Amino acid sequence: MSRQHGETTTMKTLYIFLTRSGTLLSNLVYRLTGAQYTHISLAFDEDLSCLYSSTRKNGYTMFPAGPSREYLNRGVFLMRENIPCALYALEVTDEAYIRAKRRTQHMMHHGELYRFNSLGLLLCWMHIRWRRRRH
């Protein structure tokens, strides 16, 4: 708990899980950027029972991709051993936690609005702005 302006605010924790899976796209991003981690997932519980991210919808093929649920015992995590990773715990207010959870649920329910775009990834790396509808 923390105090803000005389009020008591309870805190919750969001978990940020960074990985480099060794997939074709992960290796490409790694080579282009040199970033230690190439993928980020969000979890709402400490045991990481369900991770949320923008990734492949089928654990075995790169496309289609978009908002997805990931599980540590399936897909890429099951196919590869010794995946480099880092886990961060971010304390947030109850209000921020609820907003993050609602936004994540909205993205999962309306995945067609949040498609992954590999061309956009390349343009982003090149610092080229690309305006698209609904983005």
Q: Model regions: which residues?
A:
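Compositionally biased, low-complexity repeat tracts
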Residues: 2-3, 18, 62, 71, ...
